[in-house]
Curated annotation (Swiss-Prot):
Reactions performed catalytically: UDP-N-acetyl-alpha-D-muramoyl-L-alanine + D-glutamate + ATP = UDP-N-acetyl-alpha-D-muramoyl-L-alanyl-D-glutamate + ADP + phosphate + H(+)
Enzyme Commission number, as recorded: 6.3.2.9
UniProt KW RNA-binding keyword: no
Lineage of the species this protein comes from: Bacteria, Pseudomonadati, Pseudomonadota, Betaproteobacteria, Burkholderiales
Annotated segments matching region Disordered: 294-316
Protein name: UDP-N-acetylmuramoylalanine--D-glutamate ligase
Length: 510
């Protein structure tokens, strides 16, 4: 037996449970550390199988695929650690039974982000590599804030990589950085509630919870568990950033006035370090509350026993940029911009390069994305609006009357929060998918016309008939897409294609 075989035999056996993108990344990382692997999936041909087989020699991996509705009894034999895919629901069969067995056997259960945190700790010891880490979570806006934060940081002169839920997986990005000898100064991590459930040692320099609305209740069980999963990232963070308009995120910090807390919101900021919006002379501005120019830092007084903790002071408001100068549309995206700026500002970067980058940022695909205008009607692709909160934000943020296209797989959500915003902002609603009728039933009290469409082509055509000049036709389904489409990007692509087809039929060429 050679040295490599000896080290693998001595290393603990790791079970990779679920072979999606994060499972492949975790398997590659564990194999890189010399761990023998066992890979299990309920599917016979999981999506990540080809990628893993290409990356690793078969001899290092034992595959247990096609497990179906029950994992085999001997799956945990010899296993020291389970890396759990965020796509597996812990309280549903067959995952629930396997995790119960793992607890009985004292087998550690972690996720890919936890392995990433431990990898950074190891690199700090072996290479003295200590990057800054910024973490972003929330129901809606995570990908936009993550991508924008990375761009703001790079504009400020620091190297950065974005990874996590945004793709690539964090460990895949780390492997690439190591192989390219291109470790960044800053990691910007988009983290889902699923990922946070299995993360324990990640301690970001700054973390933000953007918002919390109903989503993934089929995975977490209830809103309390969902919010608690999101809140996990704030406690270990050196700087906690929350949305002060959202009571659920405010409740995650001890006090909005605390020295290690920052907030953003729709109102004018009052405490140093906070950001917000201000309406002045008919123009909405992105604003920041900053220290008064002549304030000198006072020496920190010795804190008396039982004295209240020190708090942040008020400051002066600085107007940074008109909201209309942003290319990303809607108030919700203005708030996303504020969150990204606060994260970048936590690295002591200046406003100038940030604002120039922010002005040019066009947003991410399928997120309040303008497809085109036809006959003075804007057609907007917000296919990523897979939950009620996202659709509420899109309707409130656009600032124009809307014909809404909504529906799909509702995931057990309560659709009633749509009622007041549809009443205020929607001229009509076109319903699609298996839960379209359920949404229509909930919206009956609004008095807003609701019509059904069999497919996206009919939905776009019906919406075009209902829209008036100056309106927007908004695809923001408030639902998952899998009843009619491969995924939400496919849904958005079909919508965009139908909009372009409509333009051709009307003789309008882009």
């Amino acid at each position: 037996m050679n040295t490599t075989e000896t080290s693998r035999a001595a290393a603990p056996l790791v079970l990779i449970l679920g072979l999606g993108e994060t499972g492949v990344a975790a398997a590659r990382w564990c194999a890189r550390q010399g761990s023998p692997l066992r890979v299990a999936d309920t599917r016979a041909q999981p999506g990540g199988l080809a990628a893993l087989q290409a990356a690793l020699a078969d001899a290092t991996v034992e595959y247990r695929l096609g497990c179906g509705e029950q994992f085999p009894p001997d799956l945990l034999d010899g296993v020291a650690q389970i890396v759990l895919s965020p796509g597996l629901v812990p309280h549903e069969s067959p995952t629930r039974e396997l995790l119960e067995q793992a607890r009985e056997r004292n087998v550690e259960v972690v996720g890919e982000i936890e392995l990433f945190a431990r990898a950074l700790a190891g690199l700090a010891e072996s290479r003295e590599y200590r990057p800054r880490v910024l973490a972003i979570t929330g129901t809606n806006g995570k990908t936009t804030v993550t991508a924008l934060t990375r761009q703001l940081i790079e504009a400020g002169g620091m190297s950065a990589r974005a990874a996590g839920n945004i793709s690539p997986a964090a460990l895949a990005a780390l492997i690439d950085a190591l192989d390219q000898d291109d470790l960044p100064q800053v990691w910007v991590l988009e983290l889902s509630s699923f990922q946070l459930e299995t993360t324990r040692t990640l301690a970001p320099d700054a973390a933000v919870v953007l918002n919390v609305t109903q989503d993934h209740l089929d995975w977490h069980g209830d809103m309390q568990a969902y919010a608690q999963a999101k809140a996990r990232i704030l406690k270990p963070a050196r700087l906690a950033i929350v949305n002060r308009d959202d009571p659920l995120t405010v409740a995650m910090v001890e006090s909005l006035q605390a020295l290690n807390v920052r907030s953003f919101g729709r109102d004018v900021p009052a405490l140093v370090g906070d950001m917000g919006l201000e309406l002045g002379q008919g123009v909405a501005w992105l604003t920041a509350c900053e220290s008064n120019d002549f304030d000198e830092p006072a020496p920190a007084p010795r804190r008396k026993k039982d004295a209240p903790p020190p708090t942040r002071a008020g400051g002066r408001m600085s107007r940074l940029m008109p909201v209309d100068a942003l290319r990303i549309r809607g108030v919700h995206n203005a708030l996303n911009a504020l969150a990204a700026m606060q994260l970048a500002r936590s690295l002591d970067l200046g406003w100038g390069p940030m604002l120039r980058t922010l002005r040019d940022y066009a947003g991410e695909p399928h997120r309040a994305e303008l497809v085109r205008s036809i006959g003075d009607v804007d057609y907007i692709n917000d296919s990523k609006g897979t939950n009620v909160g996202a659709t509420v934000a899109a309707l409130e943020g656009l600032g124009q009357q809307v014909v809404l296209i909504a529906g799909g797989q509702g995931k057990g959500q309560d659709f009633s929060p749509l009622v007041p915003v549809v009443r205020r902002h929607a001229r009509a609603v076109v319903l699609i998918g298996v839960d379209g009728a359920a949404i229509g039933k909930v919206l009956e009290p609004t008095g807003v016309p609701c019509v059904a469409a069999a497919d996206m082509r009919e939905a776009v055509r019906r919406a075009a008939e209902l829209a008036q000049p100056g309106d927007a036709v908004l695809l923001s389904p408030a639902c998952a897409s899998f009843d009619m489409f491969r995924n939400y990007p496919h849904r958005g692509e079909v919508f965009a294609a139908e909009v372009q087809e409509l333009a051709l039929d009307r003789g309008e060429v882009a």
